[in-house]
């Protein structure tokens, strides 16, 4: 059976999310609020018939996936290609600190947002290549109509840019445990929900702007 619906999920909240510190590949665990978010999402998703959940192997993602698995019978499949962008020397910093302490490097990134490779880290193009490969493998290997992909903000946005021409990552927020859903439409895909957080029922969620944003978006607070 071909995959007809894919549900993308962002991990639950960590303390670094609250502090607006960029995590990259750092093994930051969920905080208590992030666990509550994940449990709320698990209750929401337990009846949707998901057969497999492909997940980033970063700690915050795996912890979110493990909570979801308590409420479902799907197969849990870690994949390092679904990790967030590795931001090298900038990991653990706020956006303001990056701009202040690495002003030249940050300016260079703004001039070449797709191919600039952060010192010790990745470019957006690096992330796009591995995300496209992971996505292709999901479609080739998955069994069942509905599968999930638990990944991170930048990783998901670069994939969306590839799948949906005209997609603007700076115009889209993705909150913690948000759900973004797409359905197959002939030979292509159609977005049917973006940043859906209705399952949180009053629980706080937060989003981060893109590294390339020229200033903070107040919606990200």
Describe the function of each predicted region:
Residues 7, 77-79, 192:
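General small-molecule cofactor/ligand-binding pocket signal
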Residues 40-106, 175:
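Phosphate-coordination/substrate-recognition cap region in phosphate-metabolizing enzymes
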